[in-house]
Structures are given as structure tokens and as C-alpha cells.
Amino acid sequence: RVVAPSKLAGNALVVQETLDQVLSIRKAWRFNRGERRVRRLPMLAYDSLQPDTSGMATADVVDMYNGAPDRYQWALLGKREMLMPYNSYALHQKGIPYTDILQEKHVNPALLRHELHRVWVVEATLRTGFSHPYAKRRFYIDEDSWQILAVDLYNKNGELSGLQEAHSINYYDVPMFMSTLETIYDLKGGRYFVDGLDNNEPMYDFNVQLKKSDFTAAALRREGI
């Protein structure tokens, strides 16, 4: 559920994932606060746009990459040491005003931390016959956690047009290594989108008990009322 900004607050989404998204695509429903109704989304995968992102984020950039891998040709380019976003505890601090985090062209660099880490470099090239804003993607995957830390995004002309970063921390009490904030930059348009701002929100409840019925259109409808 979207909690901010106010013009989007109340919109919500529920997704049912499948184990093999090549054979069976995910199902998704969206509650629109303005219409006060739930609609089935015909497609929330590949290059379809995420709702409420002003066209900044395709469906498959959530969690740095998600969904079926079949539209790309994949290649392992090897391992290298690179400066990567890591241990982003300053960015995760409670009570920081979001206006201090989000600057005009980028996230406030004073709150970011980058460290030298060994990463696996994986390149994905769009297969012939398919379309996507990102004709090539280069993933930098943490050797220790297997978290995707950064992604270079190239357009059909081979130009670097975008960048994703996962600013991650250890949730020691779980335990789990996960991003506290994900960013995607449109280098051509001079815009960026962030996902995961929680400095002024309640902390995740990793022990919540969920039921299958919580992930249905009916549950989404009840949530939106």
C-alpha cells in the first residue's frame, strides 16, 4: 500500500507469484483510491510499467530484477572488486526527514556509503524479437550475500541510459541482508525514483503470520475500504 505522497496514498497492490513465471505468469490486482475499486492488471511483468511510478520503473526492476528471465540472453562475465553501496545504516536512520534524503537530481550523498566488494558481473542482452527500454543490463551481484547491489541499464543504441542501486543493510535480528532503499536513475531525463523509504514509518514485522487469503483481490478490497 502507498502511504505517501498524499496524492497516491491509499493506492494498493497485491501480487500472486508463481514458481515458474515462464510457464505461468504472476497475477496482480490494484486498488485505486480515486475509483475505490479493485481491478485485475492484465500484465505486471517484463517491460510493463509499475503503477504510481510516473513511468520511471518497469515491472521487472523491483528487487533489482524479478520475474521470468526468458527474454534475455544471460552471460557470466566474471568476478571483480568494485565500489558498491553497502552497510547503508546512515540512510536507514529513523526520523530523517525525507526532504533531507531526496535531493533534486539524486539521493543525498552525505547519507550514502560505498565499500570495495567482490561482485559477480552478469550481463543480460535482450533477445531478438522482444522489446524493452533496457536492451542490455549489467548486474553486479555481491559475492557474500548474492544481493544485486547495482545494475547498469543500456538502451537499444548501446548507451548507458539508467542505473539502479540497492542500498543494503544487515537486519541482524532476522537475520537477513536486504536493501533499505532502492533507486533507479534516468540518466537521460535527469529523473530518479526511489522505493523503500521507511525512516518515518513503523519497522517491518518479520514475524507477522500471513494466510493465503491475505493475497487475494477480496483482501485488497477490504484493505482499501
Residue ranges and their predicted role:
Residues 1-7, 13-69, 107, 113-210:
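Gly/Pro-enriched, hydrophobic low-complexity segments
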Residues 69-135, 217-225:
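Mature hydrolase/peptidase catalytic cores and their serpin-fold inhibitory cores, especially
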Residues 202-225:
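Compact functional segments
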